[in-house]
Regions:
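FIC/Doc superfamily catalytic core
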Residues: 1-182
Length: 182
């Protein structure tokens, strides 16, 4: 996976304490946007109620049979073989160390983890959580991808999967992060 390195918006560094405070305040919105992007029909007030009450948990086992990613135009991109994912993830972590900018590291992780499908399920959710953790640890806001921008997000994802080019997705993510950092 590659992307064009060009001038992108400056993301304001808030400091870790302020970033965590904002995360706490924005959590219902972050959760609702993530769920809505995947077709969940909960309303924002319902998400707030569930988070406040702690009414969520995951149980059980998960098994998969391979699979792939369905594109907006109906195309299909098969997953990479499972036995190659561990090495690919290790290679990704090494390559991220070569990036000086923690924002670029976090967003590149999101793009690569989403493209490689490292996780059995919830790849975009998991990649967004890891990217947000990296951002917060360096004093930036968490990554929020607004549901209102779903079409733009899906088009950038299609480009990522079809051409193995993360340029459009990196630009989109930088824009989302700049928006959520204000």
């Amino acid at each position: 996976m590659s992307w064009e390195h060009h001038e992108r918006p400056h993301i304001v560094e808030l400091g870790t304490k302020r970033g965590l405070f904002r995360l706490t305040k924005q959590l219902p919105d972050l959760v609702w946007n993530a769920a809505a992007l995947e077709g969940n029909t909960f309303t924002l007030p319902e998400v707030r109620t569930l988070l406040d009450a702690g009414l969520f948990r995951g149980e059980g086992d998960a098994e998969g049979d391979g699979g792939g990613v369905r594109l907006m135009d109906g195309g299909f991109i098969p997953f990479d073989p499972a036995d190659e994912l561990g090495e690919a993830h290790a290679d990704l972590l090494v390559s991220l160390q070569g990036l000086d900018n923690p924002v670029e590291q976090a967003l590149a992780y999101f793009c690569s983890a989403t493209r490689s499908q490292f996780y059995f399920d919830g790849n975009k959710r998991t990649a967004r959580l890891v990217a947000s953790g990296l951002l917060l640890s360096h004093g930036y806001s968490a990554l929020n991808i607004p549901h209102a921008r779903q079409l733009e997000f899906n088009l950038a994802l299609d480009e990522l999967f079809r051409a193995d080019d993360a340029t459009a997705l990196m630009d989109f993510l930088y824009d989302c992060l700049e928006e959520s950092s204000q």
